[in-house]
């Protein structure tokens, strides 16, 4: 199992990242311990197939598919004739079997030390295994690592050609994938090739193909081609066709069979910590391992004085709690002292939320039928192969046991990004943490809140910028100032304004309603929603002298309503200034579709990316007509100064950018 020397506890495979503990960063070791597992592998296919039934981000689905890692291939049996033992190997490339020139076992393989007995290599093998187990599997499996290993002094028989090939123990082979044993084909596998070179082992080509990046012989070659140096009945065939025939032949000879393998391993839930749910098991000298009966659940944690990590569970010291009676025979027994990984609790907490006050059961099935599955779940992508996978497994297992009517917990998933600073995750150790109090004291809570939502797409990481907060602060100040100015006008004597300006401002306000509502509804695109309100406020500023007071008032009321979720304080006050009413009592605005229809629109005209003019154009104008209108704009003509454009970029409905040298 994976062992964290800092936290003094075991870790699930999913909690090891690049060979280190995902919680504290310590380099993970491998130890042999008796631990408890949940058999998540029984659900591997369903966990894969049902990803197609949920509305989740594709990257999260891909991460789960890769973690489950379903592979179709063959199980081939190699035999150590000296000891009479068989060693099955899973391979997705049975077409390369004739190229196997050595055999490798993972350091954790139970037969490594036994195979070395009596060969004179016992000590070297034992020392190598000890060193290898101190390294995490994430680091060991890296393709770029220097290959190390020790010969066991034994050979096994290659079942397809009868060759005796030497057996090694090497840490680049992982026990958690396949059977912990591999047939090494250095001519067609990069890691096997590196090992063969390091130990001067034979390298044989069995697939003919072109590899300009290989050695002088074009090896290692991992592509497709035709079989060579294999067997007369297979040589000359395309390797993908021969692959199927080789498996059929192996089955007929009793030397192999079709097989499916998974990268996923059973979930190790034992933890040597105090804080966790006690594992409800007792150990009886007479009855063995006995589950705690339902009427004695839950097993409660005892009160202890010292729960610091000690290499074994702190509960082991609570002898009054450990010593108990066997539920079967009534004799003396001991409780299991490991506790469950806290991911066990987070795998079903959402079910308890539906019926949190129930003192008789975890939940009432009728209540869960009404509430489950969760319609919208929000969480970090870092939980893709941890909490999100475990929760799916729990729901499927509980459904199979008759406790649930649904087997997928979360119908829709949204994964939020992280706000970084100077390109790095904020942390006290890096000294790059932004103080919320300092931001609020300087710019106000609304500016801080709105900027966090405006900083970028909510599902992407974004870098913090103090200048960005200032920009949002200026926008909110402008909204307040314009609202105060309009509110100060006497409505009775207010100017009617230019009809075209009024129409444009009302249209812009309704466009903002439609845009913000759509962005917030399902996409959570708060950044573009805020940008739309900014556009509306900018339009009020631009048309301040030409639009009538009623149009300006409507636009500013709309801006306050739309910005209320992002900046509730200033918008509440601005709306009250304009209307005398409380904003939180108002319904969400709805767009008037009729105002959004128009025969013309204002085309932005740029020269070298800078705004130089605006012209009114027909809504159905072609790209050629838009280019001609922009070229004829008076201020564009001034800045062109007789020069011919190098390039003209036309974006219908928005702008024309004329590029000149």
Give, region by region, the residue ranges found by the protein language model.
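Glycine-rich, small/acidic residue-mixed loop/short-helix segments
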Residues: 179, 616-642, 646-653, 657
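Residues forming anionic-ligand binding surfaces in small-molecule and nucleic-acid pockets
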Residues: 221-229, 354-375
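Structured ligand/cofactor/substrate-binding pocket environments in proteins
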Residues: 60-65, 91-224, 255, 259-267, ...
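NTP-handling and nucleic-acid-processing catalytic cores
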Residues: 1-208, 310, 314, 325, ...
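Acidic, glycine-rich two-metal-ion catalytic cores of nucleic acid-processing enzymes
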Residues: 308-344
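Residue patterns forming the tRNA-binding/recognition surfaces of aminoacyl-tRNA synthetases
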Residues: 1-87, 181-298, 307, 312-317, ...
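Helix-rich, typically C-terminal accessory recognition domains appended to large enzymatic cores
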Residues: 1-7, 70, 258-287, 389, ...
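A generic secondary-structure signal for well-formed alpha-helical elements
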Residues: 11, 28, 51, 55, ...
